[in-house]
UniProtKB/Swiss-Prot annotation:
Segments passing through the bilayer: 2-22, 32-52, 61-81
Similarity annotation: Belongs to the complex I subunit 4L family.
Keyword vocabulary terms for this entry: Chloroplast, Membrane, NAD, NADP, Plastid, Plastoquinone, Quinone, Thylakoid, Translocase, Transmembrane, Transmembrane helix, Transport
EC number of this enzyme: 7.1.1.-
Lineage of source species: Eukaryota, Viridiplantae, Chlorophyta, Nephroselmidophyceae, Nephroselmidales
Pfam families: Oxidored_q2
Catalytic activity: a plastoquinone + NADH + (n+1) H(+)(in) = a plastoquinol + NAD(+) + n H(+)(out); a plastoquinone + NADPH + (n+1) H(+)(in) = a plastoquinol + NADP(+) + n H(+)(out)
GO molecular function annotation: oxidoreductase activity, acting on NAD(P)H, quinone or similar compound as acceptor; quinone binding
Protein name, UniProt field: NAD(P)H-quinone oxidoreductase subunit 4L, chloroplastic
Subcellular location: Plastid, Chloroplast thylakoid membrane
Stored HAMAP family: NDH1_NuoK
Recorded name of the encoding gene: ndhE
Origin superkingdom: Eukaryota
Gene Ontology cellular component terms for the protein in this record: chloroplast thylakoid membrane; NADH dehydrogenase complex
């Protein structure tokens, strides 16, 4: 029963993150939704690692690796968003035209 509840929580987190990723018009919300997606993946990794083969540490190691990548992605993403906000005065992705000719 606990296994299914963890998977249900991870699936709901993933769906909420995907909804926020697809519908948000604010780049900060998109970044937060992406982090929620990665946390749902981590919860799935840890759940399967714990319940399928509790003696192997592969799921935990991969989850730590994903957490480290998510932290780097958040830092770089926020730095880019801050730079764009200073230049454009908006965080609406429809208004970004930095790469257009």
């Amino acid at each position: 029963m606990i296994f299914q509840s963890y998977l249900l929580i991870a699936a709901s987190m993933f769906c909420i993150g995907l909804y926020g990723l697809l519908t948000s018009r604010n780049v900060v919300r998109v970044l937060m939704s992406l982090e929620l997606l990665l946390n749902a993946v981590n919860l799935n990794l840890l759940t399967f690692s714990n319940f399928v083969d509790s003696h192997e540490m592969k799921g935990q190691v991969l989850a730590l690796f994903v957490i480290a990548l998510a932290a780097a992605e958040a830092a770089i993403g926020l730095a880019i968003i801050l730079s764009i906000y200073r230049n454009q005065r908006t965080v609406d992705p429809e208004q970004f035209n930095l790469l257009k000719w």
